[in-house]
Amino acid sequence: ALTCSDVSNKISPCLSYLKQGGEVPADCCAGVKGLND
């Protein structure tokens, strides 16, 4: 089961991408993939 802190830690690298666009950071991609584990 995921906790809220797990989710926020894993998606935090995505926030700047979501705000500004551009390339998806590798940390974001890895974090999102990690949510499925």
Curated annotation (Swiss-Prot):
<dbReference type="GO" id="GO:0006869">
    <property type="term" value="P:lipid transport"/>
</dbReference>
<comment type="similarity">
    <text>Belongs to the plant LTP family.</text>
</comment>
<dbReference type="Pfam" id="PF00234">
    <property type="entry name" value="Tryp_alpha_amyl"/>
</dbReference>
<dbReference type="InterPro" id="IPR016140">
    <property type="entry name" value="Bifunc_inhib/LTP/seed_store"/>
</dbReference>
<keyword id="KW-0813">Transport</keyword>
<keyword id="KW-0020">Allergen</keyword>
<dbReference type="GO" id="GO:0008289">
    <property type="term" value="F:lipid binding"/>
</dbReference>
<comment type="function">
    <text>Plant non-specific lipid-transfer proteins transfer phospholipids as well as galactolipids across membranes. May play a role in wax or cutin deposition in the cell walls of expanding epidermal cells and certain secretory tissues.</text>
</comment>
<protein>
    <recommendedName>
        <fullName>Non-specific lipid-transfer protein</fullName>
    </recommendedName>
</protein>
<keyword id="KW-0446">Lipid-binding</keyword>
<dbReference type="InterPro" id="IPR036312">
    <property type="entry name" value="Bifun_inhib/LTP/seed_sf"/>
</dbReference>
<dbReference type="InterPro" id="IPR000528">
    <property type="entry name" value="Plant_nsLTP"/>
</dbReference>
